[in-house]
Regions:
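Cytosolic regulatory regions built on CNB/CRP/Popeye-like sensor folds
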Residues: 1-161
């Protein structure tokens, strides 16, 4: 015989993986569940094979990505310098939300990868539909970019050995 109330006492493990990933990205910090859902509706899920480019250096910059599964390497294709090796939960390309400059580095999947794309057009749609929410995201984005600039300045200020 099956119990009537089993589902009431189970924890919900079926949380949307996109929402779960977004809530851990500093750009979407301090958003309510409803606000996060509005952002998630504007995202685009993409899959990449191992060694497939997410974007190439000098390509038009359209938006940022959050890694759901897999890994991505950010590198300079001219000098072959690796800037970052990223995996699930990491995000990259966020500067493209603000400016229209070409990509300054390339991104390639180091293994099969599933990414969430959030593009400049999505941010503009968010700002138009929900100005307060759009401003929260812009403020968080500014904070993230400021932190990255500060860290870069500290790295450059270190004496070379």
């Amino acid at each position: 015989m099956k119990a009537i109330y089993t589902n009431y006492f189970k924890k919900k493990d079926n949380i949307d993986p996109v929402l779960k990933a977004l809530e851990n990205v500093p750009i979407f910090e301090h958003l309510t569940e409803k606000e996060l859902s509005e952002v998630a509706r504007l995202t685009h899920e993409r899959t990449y094979k191992k060694d497939e480019h997410v974007f190439k250096k000098q390509a038009p910059a359209e938006g940022m990505y959050v890694i759901l599964d897999g890994g991505v390497e950010i590198f300079d294709s001219d000098s072959e310098t690796i800037f970052a090796s990223l995996d699930s939960g990491d995000f990259f390309g966020e500067l493209a939300l603000l400016d229209e400059e070409p990509r300054s580095a390339a991104a390639i999947a180091t293994m099969p990868a599933r990414l969430i794309g959030f593009f400049r057009t999505d941010l503009l749609t968010l700002i138009k539909r929900y100005p307060e929410l759009g401003n929260k995201v812009l403020l968080n984005l500014s904070r993230v970019l400021g932190e990255r600039l500060r860290k870069t300045n500290q790295e450059l200020a270190r004496p070379t050995q």
